[in-house]
Amino acid sequence: MADTTGRIPLWLIGTVAGIAVIGLVGVFFYGSYSGLGSSL
């Protein structure tokens, strides 16, 4: 990562990463229940 000299707080990065992970998992399960993720 680039050195942001503390401009971006770690809690913000963690929050964004957490939302992204939850979103991807949600889409995966939604696709599975909809039959779109049947290939996995």
Curated annotation (Swiss-Prot):
A GO cellular component entry from the record: chloroplast thylakoid membrane
What are its GO biological-process terms? photosynthesis
Segments traversing the membrane: 8-28
Q: Which SUPFAM superfamilies is this protein grouped with?
A: Photosystem II reaction center protein J, PsbJ
Name the Pfam families on file: PsbJ
Which cysteines bridge via disulfide bonds?
none
Q: Keyword annotations for this protein? A: Chloroplast, Membrane, Photosynthesis, Photosystem II, Plastid, Reaction center, Thylakoid, Transmembrane, Transmembrane helix
- Give the matching InterPro entries: PSII_PsbJ, PSII_PsbJ_sf
What membrane topology does this protein have?
Single-pass membrane protein
Subcellular locations according to the entry: Plastid, Chloroplast thylakoid membrane
Q: What does the annotation say about its assembly with partners?
A: PSII is composed of 1 copy each of membrane proteins PsbA, PsbB, PsbC, PsbD, PsbE, PsbF, PsbH, PsbI, PsbJ, PsbK, PsbL, PsbM, PsbT, PsbX, PsbY, PsbZ, Psb30/Ycf12, at least 3 peripheral proteins of the oxygen-evolving complex and a large number of cofactors. It forms dimeric complexes.
Protein's job: One of the components of the core complex of photosystem II (PSII). PSII is a light-driven water:plastoquinone oxidoreductase that uses light energy to abstract electrons from H(2)O, generating O(2) and a proton gradient subsequently used for ATP formation. It consists of a core antenna complex that captures photons, and an electron transfer chain that converts photonic excitation into a charge separation.
What's the family? Belongs to the PsbJ family.
Question: Which protein, by its recorded name, is this?
Answer: Photosystem II reaction center protein J
* Record lineage: Eukaryota, Viridiplantae, Streptophyta, Embryophyta, Tracheophyta
